Structures are given as C-alpha cells and as structure tokens.
Regions:
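A general structural signal for short secondary-structure junctions and capping/turn motifs
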Residues: 42-47, 71-76, 128-131, 148-152
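A general secondary-structure boundary signal
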Residues: 4-13, 94, 139, 159-161
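Catalytic core of Fe(II)/2-oxoglutarate
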Residues: 109-181
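Non-catalytic surface loops within mature trypsin-like serine protease
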Residues: 12, 86-88, 162-166
C-alpha cells in the first residue's frame, strides 16, 4: 500500500496568497490570516492543527530548479503535510530509502531541521508524477526521504505541517482516517 502520497479534495477552499518574491526557495506562509475559519475549525474538530506553514518556490534556470533529497524533521517517520502545488508542467516527486547510519542533520532556509545523505547512499522506492499539478491538493509523507526532480516552469507549493493536539506530528495512518474523502 502507498503510504507516501494521496490526492485529496479538501472540503473547503484554501485562500492562496502567492509570495511577492518568487525567487526565494522557501518563505513562511501566514496561515493564521489566510485560512478561513471553516478550514481551521475542520482541523480543530479532529484534534489536529497546523503547526506551521511555508511556501516552496522552484523554477528553471535558477539556483533552485529542484528540491534536493531530504526528510523533514530530526528522524525518519511517517508524518504528513498537506501540500497544494501550482506548476504549468508535470512535477516528479521521488521518495527514497537509506540506511540511517548515512543520515546527516541539516536546516532549511527557515531554520527547520531536516535529514540528508550523500546521493550515492539512496535507493529510490516510489515515484509520483503529477501530470496536472495546477492547484493539486495532496497528503504528503514528509517524514520519509523525498525530493523533486528539475522542473520546466515555476513551481510553487504551499505546505501545511499538521500536528496532533499534543504537539506531535500527525502520522500517515491516522491521517488516512481523518482525510478519507
């Protein structure tokens, strides 16, 4: 069974406010002021919330035309994000496996922790080709090693990091129960 990617049709609209600077790889997203109360209440009713949100921008002919292989956080697990991706061309997302002894801690431009490893230490385990990702909403396993291949056009992804009421990350199996629509 795939525990890495699932397209969802969220029952409420998401108010997309695109960053003014499309050439920064990662910027904070003000979800508190840009999400409807209906959207936030849906999470609250299920004892989950958005821990933080950011926007990732990658584009051709720039320093950032792909997303390097990494795992979000301090360890490998199955925590999820909700992503909304906008891109005029198909996007390829890959997930990878590696022996944990090769993992190295690093940080994103927003100072969030992540794990990386040398490229020759990875084994590709799953690929998802988003053929028409313009506004596609999906659950995304961010706790496993993943990366995006080079893109042909500007690609903007809104990432919502989902947490349980106790502050822990929402894990894939529980997300499948909550987002079964």
């Amino acid at each position: 069974m795939n525990n890495l990617y699932k397209e969802i049709n969220f029952p409420f609209p998401f108010n997309f406010v695109f960053p003014k600077d499309k050439f920064k790889i990662q910027v904070r997203y003000d979800f508190e002021n840009n999400l409807s109360d209906e959207y936030k209440n849906w999470f609250f009713e299920r004892d989950i919330y958005i821990g933080h949100a950011h926007v990732v921008n990658i584009g051709p002919n720039s320093k950032y035309d792909y997303v390097p292989i990494h795992g979000d956080g301090d360890w490998i697990d199955n925590h999820v994000k909700i992503n909304y991706t906008f891109c005029k061309h198909p996007v390829t997302i890959n997930w990878y496996d590696t022996d944990e002894k090769y993992l190295k801690k690093s940080y994103t431009p927003l100072n969030h922790s992540m794990l990386t490893a040398d490229e020759d230490k990875y084994t590709k385990m799953y690929t998802k080709n988003q053929l028409n990702p313009n506004g596609q909403c999906y659950l995304f396993n961010a706790g496993q090693l993943h990366g995006l291949e080079k893109v042909e056009s500007l690609c903007t992804t809104f990432c919502l990091v989902i947490k349980n009421k106790d502050g822990s990350h929402l894990q894939w199996d529980k997300a499948m129960e909550l987002f079964d629509f």
